Swiss-Prot record:
GO terms for cellular component: cell cortex. The gene is PFN4. Gene3D superfamilies: Dynein light chain 2a, cytoplasmic. This is Profilin-4. Keywords: Cytoplasm, Developmental protein, Differentiation, Lipid-binding, Spermatogenesis. GO terms for biological process: acrosome assembly; flagellated sperm motility; manchette assembly; sperm flagellum assembly; spermatogenesis. Its main location: cytoplasm. Coiled coil: none annotated.
């Protein structure tokens, strides 16, 4: 297991309020690491990278299509994108090199998912990643 994968598992999935997580390399538009069982397709990667490449207001208006579901965007700015679909959601945080992706499902607290993902994003930005 790579250092980055164990970081995802320990800091995000370890909260019990993140269902799955992944790191996407922004420049290469490719998946770097993901939690076991989290299959992020090239189409999903493009969707997330484009969500930040476009004007954040556009992502907010149009929402996000991720992993076969339409999500309503509840926050979109330079560094963060939060979207939800009923009782599930996706949190995406941008660092210098990566998009950090975390999902939550019914019964999990979105606020804990957001806090853990944003904290890991801050850590990676401070490390220059």
């Amino acid at each position: 297991m790579s250092h980055l994968q164990s970081l995802l598992l320990d800091t995000l999935l370890g909260t019990k309020h993140v269902d799955s997580a992944a790191l996407i390399k922004i420049q290469e538009r490719s998946l770097c690491v993901a939690s076991p069982g989290f299959n992020v397709t090239p189409s999903d990667v493009r969707t997330l990278v484009n969500g930040f490449a476009k004007n954040p207001l556009q992502a907010r208006r149009e929402g996000l299509y991720f992993k076969g579901k339409d999500y309503r965007c509840v926050r979109a700015d330079e560094y963060s994108l939060y979207a939800k679909n009923e009782n599930t959601g996706v949190v995406v945080v941008k660092t210098h090199l990566y998009l950090l992706v975390a999902t939550y499902t019914e019964g999990m607290y979105p606020s804990i998912c957001v806090e853990a993902t944003e904290s890991l994003g801050d850590y990676l930005r401070k490390k220059g990643s």
